[in-house]
Amino acid sequence: TLCALCGVPMPFDGESPALEPVLAPARAALGAEPVRRCLVFAPDALGDQFAAARPDLAAAVAAVAPLAVPLHSIDPPWTPVCFASMFTGASPARHGIRKYEKPVLAIDTVFDAFTRAGRRVAIVAVADSSLDRIFRGRALDYYSEKYDPWVTEKALSLVAADRHDLVIAYHQEYDDVMHALGPVHPRALRGARNHVEAFVDLAAAVESAWARH
């Protein structure tokens, strides 16, 4: 879907078609023009339980990003398995990550596809996280940060600089606390609130800094 929106050929190993419910409104808004700048905010583990427990936060996300397309999680739903599938378009059987492990992916990814198309990519993630590790060794810019607030700060600076076509920003506080205390524990939901607030700030920065695109 990301490749289709941006006019980039999909990864060689991709098995999943682009999501038409996402492409249709993009075509209606842009016609044949591709998306020229894209921010992907990737907070770990936010799903239906979060939305049910804090509908106010889900509404805050919808106010900024109103299009929602329900999807099933990859099985098994471990972070590296999910992100490997998301950014390759391939199943775990194809990309090779089937448990909680962080090898560098050997197959083609969205990031490879973007760089082949001459697009500049940045991944901003908490140091040693799955997203920080499994996509290494590619011709893109990696920023390994101390924790979520530093990720947000760096992502905001990259958006303002306007030199990257695709910026990925990964947060993990909700996932960290959820595994320790449960998905609807107040501390976990406080982490979710922090993710939503960061997303709102990043979306506002994108609207301002990338308006000419």
Stretches with model-predicted labels:
Residues 153, 175-213:
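A long, amphipathic alpha-helix that forms part
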Residues 1-8, 13-27, 35-40, 47-162:
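Active-site-proximal alpha/beta segments of enzymes that process anionic O-linked groups
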Residues 43-46, 172:
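DG-centered beta-turn motif at the end of beta-strands
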Residues 152-181:
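Active-site regions of oxyanion-processing enzymes, predominantly non-cytosolic
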Residues 115-120, 159-165, 201-212:
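Secondary-structure boundary elements
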Residues 114-126, 168-179, 212-213:
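Short secondary-structure transition/capping segments
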Residues 37-39, 166, 213:
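Structural motif
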